[in-house]
Amino acid sequence: LWCNISFADNYKIGQEIENEFRFTKKIKFPLESGTWTVIEKSGWFYGDIKVRVIGIVLIENDEIISFREFQEGTLTGSFQSELNTALYEYFYLDKYDGCYQRTEYTLVKKYSKGTSTNCLVVEHMDVNKELYNPDDSKRTHERMNYRKLINNYNIKVPDIMLASWHAYFSRTVSGNLYTVGYYDNPKYFNGPKHKFSTEDTSEYHPSNINKHPKFKKYMDEFIKISAARHMEFEKIVSAKTHHRLDFSLIGIDNKEKTKVKTLKNNDMIKQLNDLKKLLDEGVITQDEFTKAKKKILN
């Protein structure tokens, strides 16, 4: 019998966190500056097998800037053969997503041998499709808390976000699966303004991007940032050296100390926060706020 479970990490829906997200004292991921809110907490267990997923979001002025999704799977104990088969299907045989090249993916890099998999996927995401009409209809339920937050608080959702997915599992290291999803709103990270807002028509789609040089340049930069994030991810989960991905072809030296360059324009966020404070204090009118906000974002 598969059961829902509340895990001991004590993260709660609505909880605000800063600086880092942690599963354990050892497994912890740095967060960009700002106050992140936990909006998703789910999981299941069966005997010794436990999986937990935590989703957090960064919002400014009622608009989504970024969200992150962390997964830990403790896959030890019994049923090792069945679990190995299930992991292979999860990574490589899922009909809708996985660690294999798809037409909408910009980049897939992986290491795979035996039961070990190290994977990075970079893509653009049609947010409305993902929230309300995903290719895999089962995922509609998974995004329920995201939709609830958006509807209850009138949150503005970007049409397109850039995304990277990072995954590692190896029984030679531990019995734990770790995945991290990064999703960023280009509007807040100096991205070019887009005209097309669906997965297939987006300027970021691999079939279209070469016709849009500004978007190609921006995506190339996002790929480098995603690669640096993945190198940091590999260190956090203690990936074996010979399992680690090679990013030399995109200009990143794996032997150098990794410093993750953030997309975030902290100055822009500060300006928007200061502007909102002036509005809340009655120093400026709503019309003045709207005009000033538009000027900052442009």
Segments (PLM) and residue ranges:
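Sec-dependent signal peptide cleavage junction
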Residues: F7-A8, I13, N254-T262, M268
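N-terminal Sec/ER secretory leader and immediately downstream segment
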Residues: D9-L107
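Mature extracytoplasmic/lumenal regions of exported proteins
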Residues: E63-E256
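Cys/His-rich metal-coordination motifs, chiefly Zn-binding "fingers/knuckles"
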Residues: K259-N298
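Sec-exported extracytoplasmic/periplasmic mature domains
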Residues: T37-E40, M231-E234, S238, H242, ...
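Extended hydrophobic/Leu-rich segments
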Residues: F7-A8, I17, I250, L272
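Structural motif
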Residues: F23-T24, V173, L279
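N-terminal signal peptide c-region/cleavage motif recognized by signal peptidases
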Residues: C3-I5
